[in-house]
Amino acid sequence: MNSLLMITTCLILIGTVLAEDGYLFDKRKRCTLECIDKTGDKNCDRNCKNEGGSFGKCSYFACWCKGLPGITPISRTPGKTCKI
């Protein structure tokens, strides 16, 4: 029982450490996902959750996500935006 609890705790911690926050980034087009402040929150949230994030919102005309897996391409700044 203690082993199961310890393994579960480790998996939760690993998931928390490997999660990243940032702007969704399209490597092929080399740009961040475009949105319109406030009205784009639903689309950003949906796109972020599709990529494995916990939630997303529109910030500086680009989709910002929280809790993305470490393998998801992100940008730390909004930069050049594009429609994906």
Curated annotation (Swiss-Prot):
Disulfide bonds: C31-C82, C35-C58, C44-C63, C48-C65
Primary location recorded for the protein, binned into one broad class: secreted
Matching Pfam families: Toxin_3 (PF00537)
Function comment: Beta toxins bind voltage-independently at site-4 of sodium channels (Nav) and shift the voltage of activation toward more negative potentials thereby affecting sodium channel activation and promoting spontaneous and repetitive firing.
Gene3D superfamilies assigned: Knottin, scorpion toxin-like (3.30.30.10)
GO terms of molecular function: sodium channel inhibitor activity; toxin activity
Gene Ontology CC terms, in alphabetical order: extracellular region
InterPro entries in UniProt: LCN-type_CS_alpha_beta_dom, Scorpion_toxin-like_sf, Scorpion_toxinL, Scorpion_toxinL/defensin
Family, per entry: Belongs to the long (4 C-C) scorpion toxin superfamily. Sodium channel inhibitor family. Beta subfamily.
Domain of life: Eukaryota
The keyword Signal is annotated on this UniProt entry: yes
Signal peptide interval: 1-19
Protein name: Toxin CsE9
Domain LCN-type CS-alpha/beta stretches: 20-83
Tissue localization of expression: Expressed by the venom gland.
Assigned keywords, A-Z: Disulfide bond, Ion channel impairing toxin, Neurotoxin, Secreted, Signal, Toxin, Voltage-gated sodium channel impairing toxin
Cellular location(s): Secreted
